[in-house]
């Protein structure tokens, strides 16, 4: 399967990517930071998901996992608008099997900046 994951440079996103790679899938990761995964089946795109004009044309994916998130003054632009943008561009296509959204307790509780 072909899997797209946002927020793959560390944490949950990196762990998810490594799991799919271990199972033999092709993974494309998107993150503002440089790649932290080195694998023959991994492609890293260094970009900010808020910048829709930078979204590259990519081959269709079977699974899209929206994992990128921040907890600062940019949270609406990244956590909401960026997630919507990625889903519209890559998740709404014929043949898509799953679109997963990953969030945190901050989405329910919020916090001060």
Where does each model-flagged region fall?
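Conserved glycine-rich Rossmann-like NAD(P)H-binding loop of the short-chain dehydrogenase/reductase
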Residues: 23-37
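Conserved NAD(P)H cofactor-binding loop of Rossmann-fold oxidoreductase domains
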Residues: 67-72
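Catalytic loop of short-chain dehydrogenase/reductase
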Residues: 98-113
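A short, exposed helix-loop element centered on a Lys and neighboring polar residues
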Residues: 87-88
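Conserved Rossmann-fold cofactor-binding substructure of NAD(P)-dependent oxidoreductases
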Residues: 46-60
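N-terminal Rossmann NAD(P)H-binding glycine-rich loop of SDR-like oxidoreductase domains
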Residues: 9-18
